[in-house]
């Protein structure tokens, strides 16, 4: 049964939508970013996302959000791949085996005649470790592939990892193990031109498995990703306090402290011993002697994108400073002015309203251009 907290949010949603619409046409809403000021539907989507998420529980996610990546791609084929621009769309790569910590993974696009040197984007999605792949993310990724296909003879194939979710009864560290295992399968097949991309919780998983690779490297020879791209990474899952940008940007972003804290603790199965764990909370895991020796970070092959108005802003700036990245490569830590959480997808790649048909215009947007430029440089080196 739906939680009372979410039911209340659903019943009061029309009031929020009416109020947001009035503000949009008068003094402006809480989302002042240029992309949202000129797109009412996207602004309403962001307002709805914030309002509903405040009442969302893990149980609600289990009821309403349960599609696998395969079924999500099938449902959205007309939206994402209407002209068959994404080769081998939906093709399986790995199959789920719980006892081996292996999840399903699926190609959003895989170039024909793929070779070991072809670039690959390994994507880990966000959603507080509880929500599955969302169409909003897939629209942005499909646009990204289409953009690369106009500028590269061999555009990067994009592999989607459908890792196990808290809403399915799976908790830490299964998600980290699954994502690392898919990466290891790619490595075992000889692929080396791999850049790992993740937003929000996906960013956490990337950093967690980089740390695991670092630990493995003490005993064995390892293969590192060629590049790492983090969009609004969630760095403090269970130990955050409602101070700084968590408080200052409350109501200006699409997520809030209370919801994040609730889902973060569910990720560790409410084990209090893990609430202050530096393995779970990457922002507490900031030993510069470790992170500065991880090749993608050491060589500046890492990009961190986040918004000025998002609640994660301060912890992202703090962590990138503590590990030395902000000082060594300031051009790799980029803040979108007045941007919100995962703005590349919510602000610049709307999945509702007017679609992005002009890729030349799309690639000039701040976050898109930053990611595109970084990926292209990484692939071609």
Swiss-Prot record:
The keyword Electron transport does not apply. Residues 1-9 are cytoplasmic. The active site is at residue 200. Its EC number is 3.1.1.-. InterPro entries: AB_hydrolase_fold, GDXG_lipolytic_enzyme, Say1-like. Residues 31-381 are lumenal. One of its GO terms (cellular component) is endoplasmic reticulum. Coiled coil: none annotated. The chain crosses the membrane at residues 10-30. It is a single-pass type II membrane protein. GO terms for molecular function: steryl deacetylase activity. GO terms for biological process: meiotic cell cycle; sterol metabolic process. Keywords: Cytoplasm, Endoplasmic reticulum, Glycoprotein, Hydrolase, Meiosis, Membrane, Signal-anchor, Transmembrane, Transmembrane helix. A motif (Involved in the stabilization of the negatively charged intermediate by the formation of the oxyanion hole) lies at residues 125-127. It is found in: Cytoplasm; Endoplasmic reticulum membrane. It is an enzyme of class 3 (hydrolase). Glycans are attached at residue 193. Belongs to the 'GDXG' lipolytic enzyme family. Required for the deacetylation of acetylated sterols. Has a role in meiosis. This is Putative steryl acetyl hydrolase mug81. It comes from Schizosaccharomyces pombe (strain 972 / ATCC 24843). The gene is mug180.
């Amino acid at each position: 049964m739906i939680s009372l907290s979410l039911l209340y949010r659903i019943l009061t949603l029309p009031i929020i939508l009416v109020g947001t619409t009035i503000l949009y046409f008068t003094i402006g809403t809480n989302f002042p970013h240029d992309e949202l000021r000129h797109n009412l539907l996207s602004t309403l989507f962001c307002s709805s996302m914030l309002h509903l998420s405040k009442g969302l529980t893990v149980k609600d996610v289990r009821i309403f959000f349960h599609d696998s990546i395969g079924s999500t791609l099938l449902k959205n084929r007309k939206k994402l791949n209407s002209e068959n621009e994404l080769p081998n769309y939906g093709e399986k790569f790995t199959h789920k085996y719980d006892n081996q910590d292996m999840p399903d993974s699926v190609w959003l696009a895989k170039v024909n005649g793929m070779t070991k040197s072809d670039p690959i984007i390994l994507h880990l999605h966000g959603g507080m470790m509880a929500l599955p792949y969302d169409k909003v993310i897939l629209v942005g990724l499909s646009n990204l592939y289409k953009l690369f296909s106009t500028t590269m003879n061999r555009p990067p194939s994009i592999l989607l990892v459908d890792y196990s979710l808290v809403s399915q009864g799976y908790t830490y560290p299964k998600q980290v193990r699954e994502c690392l295992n898919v990466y290891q399968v790619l490595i075992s097949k000889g692929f080396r031109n791999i850049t790992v991309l993740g937003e929000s919780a996906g960013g956490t998983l990337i950093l967690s498995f980089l740390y695991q690779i670092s630990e493995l490297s003490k005993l064995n020879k390892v293969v590192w990703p060629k590049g790492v791209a983090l969009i609004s990474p969630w760095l403090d899952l269970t130990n955050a306090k409602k101070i700084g940008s968590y408080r200052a940007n409350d109501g200006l972003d699409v997520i809030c402290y209370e919801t994040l804290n609730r889902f973060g603790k569910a990720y560790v199965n409410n084990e209090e011993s893990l609430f202050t764990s530096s393995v779970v909370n990457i922002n507490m895991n900031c030993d510069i002697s470790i992170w500065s020796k991880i090749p993608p970070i050491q060589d500046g092959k890492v990009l961190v994108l986040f918004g000025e108005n998002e609640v994660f802003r301060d912890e992202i700036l703090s962590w990138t400073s503590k590990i030395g990245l902000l000082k060594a490569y300031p051009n790799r830590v980029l803040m979108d002015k007045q941007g919100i959480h995962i703005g590349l997808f919510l602000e610049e790649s709307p999945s509702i309203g007017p679609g992005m048909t002009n890729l030349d215009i799309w690639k000039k947007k701040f976050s898109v251009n930053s990611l595109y430029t970084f990926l292209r440089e990484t692939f071609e080196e």
